């Protein structure tokens, strides 16, 4: 980037993943978050704009606080990158915040942590009002064992047992700082905070925790599964519907504030 001519901006956005085929642009013009965002940014900038995201999300996965950076020669106030861009975005995406950042800022590589929430409905019949908003199981779940199993995730570990076959991460070793599991009104919430996550890692963890909660896998079996470091013996990947990227952490010098998780979630 020519810093004499271009500015670097960081924006925080929220999106409904059920409306898009994931974050990344794809051939054939299928709707993706990146394609829609870059089209809207270009309308305000008056030039093509390329975006870099903190963490790519799959089809059906939502975000309440995704972070993206882009470079532009256009001189615009922050509100232009919020209200102006939102006026050109399709339903299902909204820019929440915009901030000019240092030229060396990188949305992905400067991130020190990421936060995910999985929202799970446990009920005999799936609520039509929660379709695409929460995962679902008809099984009755015992939250106690699920909490004990989730606690085993904390720390630096090899998470190969929860890694997708096509994962491109250089190493399966990641650090989980916090793993909290709560239940209220038939909804289970799994909150994970880690330095980084493998492809499908949260959905694979949730799949295993559902096995624990339904009695198909013991807490000891969950611990053994982690130590196996193999996807072959692990439960199936859980549905994307209930997965939300809820925040990305950065050093304070960048001034990027992580929004609170919405109360409805």
From Swiss-Prot:
Tagged with keyword Acyltransferase: no
GO terms for biological process, alphabetical: tRNA pseudouridine synthesis
InterPro entries referenced in this protein's UniProt entry, alphabetically: PsdUridine_synth_cat_dom_sf (IPR020103), PsdUridine_synth_TruA (IPR001406), PsdUridine_synth_TruA_a/b_dom (IPR020097), PsdUridine_synth_TruA_C (IPR020095), TruA/RsuA/RluB/E/F_N (IPR020094)
CDD domains assigned to the protein according to its UniProt record, in alphabetical order: PseudoU_synth_EcTruA (cd02570)
Record-level Gene Ontology MF annotations: RNA binding; tRNA pseudouridine(38-40) synthase activity
Enzymatic reactions: uridine(38/39/40) in tRNA = pseudouridine(38/39/40) in tRNA
Entry keyword set: Isomerase, tRNA processing
EC number: 5.4.99.12
Active site location: 58 (nucleophile)
UniProt: substrate binding residues: 116
Disulfide bonds: none
Enzyme class: isomerase
Function: Formation of pseudouridine at positions 38, 39 and 40 in the anticodon stem and loop of transfer RNAs.
Subunit and interaction comment: Homodimer.
Family: Belongs to the tRNA pseudouridine synthase TruA family.
Protein's UniProt name: tRNA pseudouridine synthase A
Organism: Neisseria gonorrhoeae (strain ATCC 700825 / FA 1090)
